UniProtKB/Swiss-Prot annotation:
Enzyme Commission number(s) of this protein: 6.1.1.4
Top EC class of this enzyme: ligase
Keywords: Aminoacyl-tRNA synthetase, ATP-binding, Cytoplasm, Ligase, Nucleotide-binding, Protein biosynthesis
Family in the record: Belongs to the class-I aminoacyl-tRNA synthetase family.
Name of the protein described by the UniProt record: Leucine--tRNA ligase
Record field: catalytic activity: tRNA(Leu) + L-leucine + ATP = L-leucyl-tRNA(Leu) + AMP + diphosphate
GO biological process: leucyl-tRNA aminoacylation
Keyword presence, Secreted: no
CDD domains: Anticodon_Ia_Leu_BEm, LeuRS_core
Motif 'HIGH' region, residue numbers: 51-61
Motif ('KMSKS' region): 636-640
Length: 869
């Protein structure tokens, strides 16, 4: 064994329990993964979305962080200066819930969980620079967050207003629209209510157009994520005009994206939060009762879309803008949002299902404004809502249209209204400002003070951080009482005004936890800096070159982070180049497992852990009783369904490399992977086979090097070159499963080869380098066994000799509609069908197809691939 690698005899068998800790200690001793800026090197910043410290890692963590680790290790071997950090998204309600349940403290619970999870993650062998670790509940972190809040406030990016909010009655806090799922709180599951409170908001809407247009430049993001964000931002062009009231009251302005359907208007609807509704409620008890009833429903579009339609006839009428003799009733309707458009609409039930349901319920008229070209049947119980691009036949359209698409009619109507002087075309966005106030203890305090003399006063930066109190004047904080403990903490709450020194009161709301995760990527570049970022460090490390995480964060976290990067740039904390913080995004699939269930005596399903079940040729049975078990294949791992696999148990039984190898091997990383015991066993056996190959070559190192033919040696060299090329391509293209498949094949080739032992040793050392990103511990062991110098983690990535690839491969240009867009390196003798499969999997082809199929796919063997769309 070389002198600069860990001492100790090689094990007599493949023993991960002996091998893996040894090499982790070696990496730590050498400081292998310490990120250091080096102007002479190109940098690479790889980041996985950091975890919430629940106290236990799961297989999803293993897959997610292994993916990032493969990229980080590969890039380091390619000569990049790599930043691969880890931290903890540590604020939030679960810690307070735990305190309520156990009588403990959220801080103690959180930091204990962090220690547990760190200890569980380190055995995975991740190439993380742990010296940069932080938790968002660290005072040093949220103190800098408070400093940025004050910067945002100074720039006009934060403001305070009364707003109807989503109130979670169980967690007793406000939820952002994105945190309300099907009308329920995303954590508690409670029915969300409407309440009007004074809240703090980030002015994300100021950036709506920029956030939307910049999506086109995110070419290395999944198209589905960009589409989800575009839909959430929701840019639309419509008509703004006002209905004149017949009683002489103030006109009612409306905004509509379908002004072409104005002749089908049935009523004017106003939001429960509209000034007219509020004024009526103050005068009429029946209106106040109605508003109280609808306040018990959710406030989001999704919640209101599915909720029963409720309305109240105000008795007010308005005049139609095209016919002053045509009067429309004004209804308060629970499905109308106050913070989109003007809080008032006109309803066209024939061409909007929501409006139609409302009109059928309250017996209001339904007027068709257009029909399908071949079907003049009036609307029944289903609204006729064709795509805007589909031509339809119009019923006496006031702009003179007969047959036209909806989009053409919209533009014609806007032109008509502007020419007539009663309306104007405007653009609107669905994206609304981000309400960040939360009525909870375990979050970042908002650094402002309320003074009777001065009003709302920003805290002085020299007083930051405004730290959370650990106790209440020496007594434990009682988290069992509903509400925010900070409201009940006078020694923390009561303070001097930073402006005049008079008695004042701290803001007791804390920040939404999505604030914490909206800038952590920048903090990792200089986690101990006395300012939010350090110009030199952030200038070197940003942007994040590769970001990895679940698609469930497409709207909440990713959109907020894009906003924060822009706001941080405006305040001088990020350079212009970092306004889009993530250059590339990869959204991984889940780790799944079969569900095993029987039926209980009460008829309800009983779920069983995988270790309680034995699978036979006839099916599955319980080990204890032999009772038959129903199997639900490949479901998301869930504690409630008992189909979870404990990563720690897998590591204890097989080693971390087996877990890493399996989650990389079985499926493309963007798809779900099903964990099976047989798959884990097969992965372990394969790694043992690689170890035995190395052990055999180590023990017989002195055998004559002349054994084996020159042709066998050349064949093995060609196989090594192909393995280097294909494993490299797989890692570069996030096709880790293809890299693993090639390494399986390469193992077989080495094992069967009759080449001289020196050549086999060289091939297996190459194998160790290629396996290092996936199975780093075994790779180090094999590298050491075969006389490799230093650590394989620090060895340069092998390069394939082009001469050894020439005779076996050919590069085919890929033309899309006659223009060269990509190329494909394939074996010369690859069947046409295999070339077609690879061509259809090419990134440029996938992007051009956009989920569709090509009209033609023409492969000219050895020359070109033509894709016709």
């Amino acid at each position: 064994m070389p002198a600069d690698t860990p001492a100790g005899s090689a094990p007599a068998r493949f023993d991960p329990a002996q091998i893996e800790p040894k090499w982790r200690a070696a990496w730590d001793l050498a400081g292998t993964f310490t990120a250091t800026p080096d102007p002479a090197k190109q940098k690479y910043y790889v980041l996985e979305m950091f975890p919430y410290p629940s106290g236990r890692i799961h297989m999803g963590h293993v897959r997610n962080y292994t993916m990032g680790d493969v990229i980080a290790r590969y890039k380091a071997s390619c000569g990049f200066s790599v930043l691969h950090p880890m931290g903890w998204d540590a604020f939030g309600m679960p810690a307070e819930n735990a305190a309520m349940a156990t009588g403990g403290h959220p801080k103690d619970w959180t930091y204990a969980n962090i220690a547990e999870m760190r200890a569980q993650m380190k055995p995975l062998g991740l190439s993380i620079d742990w010296s940069r670790e932080f938790a968002t509940c660290d005072e040093a972190y949220y103190g800098q967050q408070q400093s940025m809040f004050l910067d945002f406030l100074e720039k006009g990016l934060v403001y305070r207003k009364n707003a109807v909010v989503n109130w979670d009655p169980v967690d007793m806090t406000v939820l952002a629209n994105e945190q309300v799922i099907d009308g329920k709180g995303w954590r508690s599951g409670a029915e969300v209510e409407r309440r009007e409170l004074t809240q703090w908001f980030f002015k994300i809407s100021d950036f709506a157009d920029d956030l939307l247009s910049a999506l086109d430049g995110l070419e290395n993001w999944p198209e589905k994520v960009r589409l989800m964000q575009a839909n959430w931002i929701g840019k639309s062009r419509g008509l703004e005009f006002a209905f004149a009231r017949t009683d002489g009251g103030d006109p009612i302005p409306v905004y509509t994206t379908r002004p072409d359907t104005l002749m089908g208007a049935s009523f004017v609807g106003i939001s429960p939060g509209h000034p007219i509704a509020k004024a009526l409620a103050a005068q009429r008890p029946e209106v106040a009762d109605f508003l109280a009833e609808v306040a018990r429903g959710g406030t989001t579009e999704a919640a209101l879309e599915t909720a029963p339609k409720l309305g109240f006839d105000t008795g007010i009428t308005v005049r139609h803008p095209l016919d002053p003799n045509w009067e429309l009733p004004v209804w308060i309707a629970n499905f109308i949002l106050m913070d989109y458009g003007t809080g008032a609409i006109f309803a066209c039930p024939a061409h909007d299902q929501r409006d139609l349901d409302f009109c059928r319920k309250y017996d209001l008229p339904v007027i068709d404004t257009f029909f399908a070209l071949d079907d003049p049947t009036p609307v029944g119980d289903t609204a006729f809502v064709p795509p805007k691009t589909e031509p339809v036949r119009w019923v006496e359209h006031f702009a003179g249209l007969d047959i036209a698409t909806g989009q053409e009619a919209i533009e014609a109507t806007i032109d008509f209204a502007e020419a007539a002087g009663w309306g104007r075309g405007v653009e609107q966005f669905r994206l609304r400002d981000w309400g960040l106030s939360r009525q909870r203890y375990w979050g970042c305090p908002i650094p402002v003070v309320h003074c009777d003399k001065c009003g709302v006063v920003p805290e002085r930066k020299e007083n930051l951080p405004i730290a959370l109190p650990y106790d209440e004047d020496g007594r434990p904080i009682d988290f069992s009482i509903p509400g925010n403990p900070l409201d009940r903490h006078p020694s923390w709450r009561d303070c001097a005004c930073p402006a005049c020194g008079a008695p004042a009161r701290r803001e007791t709301d804390t920040m939404d936890t999505f604030v914490d995760s909206s800038w952590y990527f920048a903090r990792f570049t200089a986690p101990r800096a006395e300012t939010p970022t350090d110009p030199a460090e952030v200038g070197y490390w940003m942007n994040v070159d590769q970001y990895i995480g679940g698609v469930e964060h497409a709207i909440l976290h990713l959109l907020y982070s894009r906003f924060f990067a822009r706001a941080m740039h405006l305040c001088g904390h990020l350079p212009e180049s970092a306004r889009e913080p993530f250059d590339a995004l990869f959204t991984q699939g889940m780790v799944t497992h079969a569900i095993y269930k029987t039926t209980g005596t009460d008829g309800r399903p009983v779920y069983h852990y995988p270790e309680e079940v034995e699978t036979t040729e006839e099916g599955a049975v319980l080990k204890k009783t032999g009772a038959p078990v129903d199997i639900v294949p490949s479901a998301k791992m869930s504690k409630s369904k008992n189909n979870v696999v404990d990563p720690l148990a897998i590591i204890d039984a097989y080693g971390a490399d087996t877990a890493r190898w399996f989650v990389m091997s079985d499926s493309p990383p963007e798809r779900d992977v099903e964990w099976t015991a047989s798959g884990a066993e097969a992965a372990f056996k394969h790694l043992g086979r690689v170890w035995r190959l190395a052990e055999d070559l180590r023990r017989n190192a002195e055998e004559a090097a002349t054994a084996g033919s020159a042709e066998e040696a050349r064949a093995l060299a060609r196989a090594s070159a192909r393995a280097i090329a294909e494993v490299t391509a797989g890692i570069e293209g996030f096709a880790f499963n293809k890299s693993v498949a090639k390494l399986y094949e390469f193992t077989n080739t080495i094992q069967k080869s009759k080449a001289p032992r020196a050549e086999k040793r060289a091939a297996l050392k190459t194998m160790a380098q290629l396996m290092s990103p996936m199975t780093p511990h075994l790779a180090e062991e094999v590298w050491s066994m075969l006389g490799g110098i230093g650590l394989v983690a620090e060895a340069p990535w092998p390069e394939a000799d082009p001469a050894l690839l020439v005779e076996d491969t050919v590069t085919l240009p890929i033309q899309i509609n006659g223009k060269r867009r990509s190329e494909l390196a394939v074996p010369k003798d690859m069947p046409r069908e295999e070339v077609e499969k690879l061509a259809l999997a090419d990134a440029a082809v996938l992007k051009a197809l956009a989920g569709g199929a090509p009209r033609k796919l023409i492969v000219v063997p050895g020359r070109i691939v033509n894709v016709v769309i």
